[in-house]
């Protein structure tokens, strides 16, 4: 009887160890940002080895400015995604450090996690002009508001469209007015 209880305790411990989140070591950019006084969270690397870093919305512009000053001069992609119904929305920025002799330029992805109820983040249009239409698309599809953007209007959907079509909890209208093809 005592053997079975000790076995179940050992089983519970091994299950708990398996479920424990792995320790993620901060990459070079996260370490540099931490040394510069920012509070960031290392998210590890993606399947291609690109370092991912979580920052808060109130630090985003300062972090972006620091990265530009460190040579991350190219905004390869800005996008958004929905973590799932009832979960957070994410605005992400994929940055490269381009130079004349770069064979494989350093890359980093910055992510800002936002509440579904009021997804607001500062626009990085004034840091990277390339974020203009990309932020508009994230606004149009997910409802993420980029504060300070010079022209934050819908870019894909009609202006009178209701809702954010790429959110996972979006309920599509029952009727779409279709135009006949000519």
UniProtKB/Swiss-Prot annotation:
Its EC number is 7.1.1.-. Belongs to the complex I 30 kDa subunit family. It comes from Acaryochloris marina (strain MBIC 11017). It holds the Pfam family Complex1_30kDa. This is NAD(P)H-quinone oxidoreductase subunit J. It is a peripheral membrane protein. Keywords: Membrane, NAD, NADP, Plastoquinone, Quinone, Thylakoid, Translocase, Transport. InterPro entries: NADH_DH_suC (IPR010218), NADH_quin_OxRdtase_su_C/D-like (IPR037232), NADH_UbQ_OxRdtase_30kDa_su (IPR001268). NDH-1 can be composed of about 15 different subunits; different subcomplexes with different compositions have been identified which probably have different functions. The gene is ndhJ. NDH-1 shuttles electrons from an unknown electron donor, via FMN and iron-sulfur (Fe-S) centers, to quinones in the respiratory and/or the photosynthetic chain. The immediate electron acceptor for the enzyme in this species is believed to be plastoquinone. Couples the redox reaction to proton translocation, and thus conserves the redox energy in a proton gradient. Cyanobacterial NDH-1 also plays a role in inorganic carbon-concentration. It catalyses: a plastoquinone + NADH + (n+1) H(+)(in) = a plastoquinol + NAD(+) + n H(+)(out); a plastoquinone + NADPH + (n+1) H(+)(in) = a plastoquinol + NADP(+) + n H(+)(out).
